[in-house]
Amino acid sequence: GRELAGDVAVVDIGLDVSSATQHLVEAADVSAWWPNRSADAHKWNGAVRVIAGSAGMLGAGRLCAEAAARSGASLVALSSPGIDPQARSEIIQRRIPAVEFECDVFGDLDRFRALVVGPGLGRVDGTISSARAVIGEATLPVVIDGDGIFAAAWSADGAGPLLRQRGRPTVITPHDGEFALLAGHAPGIDRVADARALAAELQVVVLLKGPTTV
């Protein structure tokens, strides 16, 4: 297996790959996708709202906000329910209630271009309920990770009804355990096929985390 493969080099051997349906994402691909900032851009053109972190798991929110800033977000606002978030001074830090925080989030959410919900959020019932409300009612692209995935699936009907009705770009980032929570089974040998099947079922983009992320 992979542990015995040593160094692996990917080289062009002249095959026609024009009809390929699976691609390896490389640094050049990411660079090509990066949008150019317009000459009159300002901080609200690419602002990201992050709802993440909780007591004992503040690092998750901090890492998420830092990643958004490093990836080019023009402004990042971080909130951790019920506790003061921790991040470097360039990150806007807003405290929101531990439960029933959706009204606080929606207060100015229309100014942001993307929303992240879930890393280290915790699983208190009131927090999960508010996270579901935010995910379901947000009218901008949403990335759902960690406890946000748990919140989405926190229903007798699973995550499908909540995610399918959104009608906006949605990305979920499950590891194998969270994938099983959503799909009812762990990913098998063909992780690409399993990720595609879940994406089609939930009408979202699936980033399946692991040693080889799909």
Predicted regions and their residues:
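Small-residue (G/A/S/T)-rich helix-start motifs and N-terminal tracts that mark the onset
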Residues: 2-146, 150-171, 176-214
